[in-house]
Regions:
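Sequence-structural signature of mature extracellular/luminal beta-sheet repeat domains
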Residues: 1-264
Length: 264
């Protein structure tokens, strides 16, 4: 059963943030007792939330009427996921090292599991562009221990990929990463933001959100810069709202970052 709590821990650093939230809103605890949660996806048409408990190797479903139930077990140590333009669920899997799509009839389609004959690492997070193309990050985190999906050997460098689901063509759009993580497009899709989580440890300098300029044809990336450095901790998953603000998971909660890179 869900419970509500007052939310006195919201901190505003900029008047722009005050226009985004209701400070008398309450924080609602939907469920607890999990090990490590990732990949929340809201299905408004079904009024339910899907999310992954990675170490327990299962995807869970929350609904207001009946609470939490198991949606998929085993999940292939599923991590990030999203919906495509047809409302289907796209999921990153660590143990199978692949991206899948659940069709409307319940069938599961493997979208990609290798590039040029070499296995993917452990796909981490995914976003779908308005043209239907699927962009995903592929770090090695899910190969490093049994907790995240089982120790396996990496066959290629961490990278960011674009998949055309209509043709099956997959191409690396950026390889200069240590550990690509969450990603999302700006509202007009001229920019792609990607979390560079680097290696583990607060002292690692390669932990920040990068901003990429998307090419005119929307199929590649043409330039990059450091957009924002999260502190404390490092950037994990995030989404961009209709005003271009980034809502990003961090070590101490959720950070809201304005389009100019300011923590607000």
């Amino acid at each position: 059963m869900a419970s509500t709590h007052p939310s006195p821990c919201t901190e505003s650093y900029d008047p722009r943030f005050d226009q985004l939230v209701l400070f008398n809103a309450e924080l609602e605890l939907l469920a607890e007792g999990f090990r490590w949660l990732e990949g929340p996806v809201w299905f408004g048409d079904h009024q339910c939330l899907l999310f992954n408990d990675i170490p327990n190797n299962r995807t869970l479903r929350w609904h207001k009427q009946d609470g939490v139930s198991v949606f998929r077990e085993p999940s292939g140590f599923a991590n990030g996921q999203t919906r495509d333009r047809q409302g289907r669920l796209i999921t990153c899997h660590h143990s199978q090292r692949e991206l899948t799509r659940i069709e409307h009839n319940g069938d599961v389609t493997t979208l990609v599991n290798n590039v040029n004959g070499k296995k993917l690492n452990a796909p981490n997070d995914v976003v779908v562009k308005s043209d239907g193309s699927i962009w995903f990050s592929d770090p090695v985190y899910g190969l490093l221990n049994d907790y995240e999906g089982g120790r396996q050997t990496s066959e290629q460098h961490p990278a960011l990929y674009r998949l055309d689901p209509s043709t099956g063509e997959v191409a690396a759009v950026a390889r200069d990463f240590e550990g690509p993580n969450g990603l999302a497009f700006s509202p007009d899709e001229t920019k792609l933001y990607v979390a560079e989580s680097g290696g583990a440890g607060e002292s690692n300098p390669n932990q920040f959100i990068r901003e990429f300029e998307v090419s005119a044809d929307g199929k590649s990336l043409v330039s990059t810069k450091i957009f924002h450095k999260i502190s404390p901790g490092w950037a994990d998953g995030f989404r961009v709202d209709e005003q271009g603000n980034i809502w990003c998971g961090a070590a101490d909660g959720v950070h809201c970052i304005a389009p100019d890179g300011t923590l607000i």
